């Protein structure tokens, strides 16, 4: 038996089996003679953790036009969606936002010169609560999350190791991490693509083409986790680092790709029977990738998400 309930406790639980919300005459958390919290709830963990009605919105705008020598097309998009981890017990609710922009211009500068450009920008911001690994969090929530327990005590402290459960953390400590708003994670993505091309008609048989393309992608992970602070008795708080520690981590990832093409094309026909074509040019490509992880252990404040928040035990781990 994983529980420490007596026959009287089981009777108290049975009396509350139809209470979908806490009844004043049948409280879900009772303070025992030993000062410890004892739990007799009928708590709906599923809807308190998960957002079963996820709001999302999308807005699009585009403009196009032009004339004899110039044409353009511009478009923009905004998309937002609430995430799965967004129940009423979670303060830092999961959220996803996406902003995108694109523009294309074509211009006949002269009879012998044509220019075009194409630019796109895409930005993503995603945030989620709890431990670092969201998939493992969802898997762990299948264990030891019984309805008799609640996420918070009457004084607002977090429930993690209830006295009525034999030395086992609720949801392998994940419910406590989700209930603590200092556990938060963000993923920021920014992608920029720019293409320019120029064509010159130097002679009726000779053309010159040049293009420059750049593709830049940036991704930044920001992860803030805190040691679990919980209470199992009135006026008593405890701290454990069994599942996670006070850490702040950033992982910047970036790659940049440059491409330059330039070439001449000569094409000539004789008597509509003989054709000659020659192409000569050059290509230049440059690629750079940066992927680092900087992790700080020991934070001086639970309100500041920065490497500047330190204490006497702070140390860093850098991976490249």
Predicted regions and their residues:
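Short Gly/Pro-enriched turn/cap motifs at secondary-structure boundaries
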Residues: 50-53
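Residues that act as N-cap/strand-start positions at coil-to-secondary-structure junctions
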Residues: 55-57, 99
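Surface-exposed loop/interface segments of Gram-negative outer-membrane beta-barrel transport/assembly proteins
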Residues: 1-42, 79-191, 209-211, 215-320
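Alpha-helical support elements that line or immediately flank enzyme active sites
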Residues: 58, 65, 195-200, 214-216
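Residue-level signature of outer-membrane beta-barrel architecture
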Residues: 65-67, 107-108, 198-204, 266-268
